[in-house]
């Protein structure tokens, strides 16, 4: 199962602030991907740095990704939509230059539209045009000049257009809406922002079973196996995301997702980007938790295999042998607990006798109490 972790931006610990230096640091940390943030706009001076990063990613198989402008209004009036599409055009050009595998976009508020099929169909038509424009910009094999500058256009597919789940009730982007749209537009993929899904569901992702239901829904409605995920802690209220937090300070935990990916994720091709304020630190934490979950799974499977072999040798059913092991463990626990309780009783200190008042001190206990006193 391809599974990659990385930060959303140049690592905080990187001494240099260029993308190439950030890629070197990310690789040294044992991570395999990153997401470049074009949160507001892309200027011409960025493109030389993007091209250098694209060459490095092509030669090293380092996965590059990009996030388009944060503010979007694809469902607004014609003027607002055109302004958003112009920003998307520039980011699509940058995605080609940097050899991005995914580029993530927000859709924006519902505006005057209502949630439903009509709105989703309208958005699907817009995104179909975005995909077609991306393929035009990507170039073709016959363009020698394009091939000389961007050799990956011959080997790699055009950038996938990612449609992100939103974290506000007023914004388009529930999981159902995203899956319905990407299922009808080839060249798009769902971007599962787990913090946003958790917030809109009022804290819905708490166990590995919750994540299992999420991915089962995606598999049934979308049918693909390639997923691009954002993960971070989140502070939320009333079904709305407030702001990102570090993982250890949120009720959204990565351990249940790590457990699910270790046990059921063999069919997935997953990229997980850390949106946490700690960036690469929480990306490394997620990788460590996944490795721990994988190790526990291997140990459990080895134990089950050993139990199965012992059961065959003893002529027992493996379930019967498991029941015996559990009973023996219970008896051992009880045998250890009983002496501990006995020792605790023996060690209990005797109650101290009340101290006698000194002769040179006033003894208030001998005086009659006045029932009228408040204190």
Regions found by a protein language model. Give the residues of each.
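Hydrophobic faces of well-ordered beta-strands that scaffold small-molecule active sites
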Residues: 3-9, 34-36, 64-68, 103-105, ...
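N-terminal pre-domain/capping segments
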Residues: 1-90, 189, 299-374
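A short acidic, helix-capping loop that chelates divalent metal ions and anchors anionic groups
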Residues: 72-77, 111-115, 199-202, 238-241
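Active-site beta-loop-alpha junctions enriched in small/polar residues
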Residues: 8-12, 37-41, 69-71, 108-110, ...
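Histidine-acidic metal/acid-base catalytic patches
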Residues: 184-194, 198-375
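Acidic (Asp/Glu)-rich catalytic clusters
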Residues: 23-29, 45-65, 90-99, 131-135, ...
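Charged helix-capping and loop-helix junction motifs
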Residues: 47-54, 81-88, 119-125, 175-178, ...
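Active-site acidic/histidine proton-transfer and metal-coordination neighborhood
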Residues: 74-192
């Amino acid at each position: 199962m391809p599974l990659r972790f990385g930060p959303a931006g140049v690592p905080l610990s990187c001494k240099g602030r260029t993308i190439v230096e950030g890629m070197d640091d990310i690789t040294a940390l044992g991570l395999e991907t990153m997401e470049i943030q074009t949160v507001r706009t892309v200027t011409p001076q960025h493109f030389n740095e993007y091209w250098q990063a694209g060459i490095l990613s092509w030669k090293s198989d380092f996965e590059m990704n990009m996030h388009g402008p944060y503010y979007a209004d694809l469902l607004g009036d014609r003027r607002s939509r055109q302004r958003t599409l112009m920003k998307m055009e520039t980011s699509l050009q940058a995605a080609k230059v940097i050899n991005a595998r995914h580029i993530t976009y927000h859709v924006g508020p519902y505006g005057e539209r209502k949630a439903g099929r009509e709105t989703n169909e309208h958005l699907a038509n817009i995104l179909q045009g975005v995909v077609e424009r991306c393929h035009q910009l990507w170039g073709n094999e016959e363009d020698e000049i394009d091939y000389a500058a961007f050799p990956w256009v011959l080997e790699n597919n055009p950038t996938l257009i990612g449609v992100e789940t939103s974290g506000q009730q007023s914004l388009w982007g529930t999981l159902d809406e995203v899956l319905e749209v990407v299922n009808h537009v080839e060249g798009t993929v769902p971007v599962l922002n787990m913090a946003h899904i958790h917030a809109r569901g009022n804290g819905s992702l708490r166990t590995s079973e919750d994540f299992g239901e999420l991915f089962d829904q995606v598999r049934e409605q979308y049918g693909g196996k390639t997923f691009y995920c954002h993960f971070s802690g989140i502070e939320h209220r009333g079904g709305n995301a407030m702001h990102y937090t570090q993982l250890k300070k949120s009720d959204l935990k990565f351990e249940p997702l790590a457990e699910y990916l270790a046990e059921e994720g063999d069919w997935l091709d997953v990229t997980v980007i850390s949106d946490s304020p700690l960036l690469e630190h929480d990306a490394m934490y997620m990788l460590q938790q996944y490795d721990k979950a994988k190790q526990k799974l291997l140990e459990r499977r080895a134990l089950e295999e050993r139990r199965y072999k012992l059961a065959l040798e003893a002529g027992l059913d493996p379930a019967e042998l498991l029941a015996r092991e559990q009973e023996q463990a219970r008896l051992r626990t009880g045998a250890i607990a009983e002496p501990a309780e006995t020792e605790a009783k023996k060690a209990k200190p005797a109650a101290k006798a009340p101290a006698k008042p000194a002769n040179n001190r006033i003894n208030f206990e001998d005086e009659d109490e006045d029932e009228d006193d408040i204190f």
